[in-house]
Regions:
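The catalytic Nudix box helix
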Residues: 92-127, 141, 145
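Nudix hydrolase/Nudix homology domain
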Residues: 1-32, 87-91, 155-191
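N-terminal strand-loop-strand
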Residues: 33, 50-93, 97-98, 119-120, ...
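Active-site-adjacent beta-strand/loop module that shapes the phosphate/pyrophosphate-binding cleft
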Residues: 129-152
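Short linker/helix segments within small regulatory modules
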Residues: 44-49
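Short functional micro-motifs and their immediate structural scaffolds
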Residues: 40-43, 61
């Protein structure tokens, strides 16, 4: 997995995304040799990106997990964090996966509360980005702080979180992520 991460910064951007998407699809096809329902061999469908079981008629589609990226605003400040695990050491925004039975807006509120102990309001959808590195569909949201700005860090998930003034927001010039785009938009006063 670590080797494939180099493709996220490959230029032009479309090449990196194509390679990562191909990697995701390759891994999915390799892991879908047999039906999860009856155990018989699966065959690729001729028209759709799916695997089909001729024996029990079961169909299997690639897994895509919905996840949110959250830009929490507090006036001219943006909440930024660093993950506790993994290899990424750059600043990011609050993020997390949607749970079963949960709307994306509920996911935004839950993730912010879980990771930094803050309440938010005025949740606004920005845009989405496929993220094949984690088989996710990332959906970006901006929202406003509601109440106290006192951060209560969830140390199992984050190593740090802090408020940055608009002009102080750090970002990686070579990153092609939705997170980076949202940070730059806020820095430029567009969000």
């Amino acid at each position: 997995m670590e080797d494939i991460i180099i493709f996220r910064n490959l230029g032009p951007q479309v090449n990196g995304f194509a390679l990562i998407t191909g990697y995701q699809l390759h891994n999915w096809y390799e892991s879908r040799k047999f039906c999860g329902k009856c155990g018989h061999p699966l065959v690729p469908d001729a028209r759709e990106r799916m695997m089909y079981c001729p024996h029990c008629k079961n169909t299997e589609y690639p897994k895509i997990s919905p996840a949110v990226i959250v830009g929490v605003r507090n006036g001219n400040r943006l909440l930024m964090s660093k993950y506790a695990g993994g290899t990424a050491r750059r600043y990011a925004l609050i993020a997390g996966f949607a749970e079963i039975g949960e709307s994306l807006e509920e996911t935004v509120k839950r993730e912010v509360m879980e990771e930094v102990g803050l309440k938010v309001k005025n949740i606004e959808y920005y845009k989405s980005q496929p993220w094949s590195l984690s088989s996710s569909l990332l959906m970006g949201f901006y929202c406003d702080l509601e109440g106290s700005d006192q951060i209560v860090l969830e140390e199992d998930e984050l190593s740090e979180a802090q408020w940055f003034e608009r002009e102080e927001i750090p970002y990686d010039d070579y990153d092609v992520s939705l997170t980076r785009e949202m940070m730059i938009r806020f820095k430029k006063g567009l969000a």
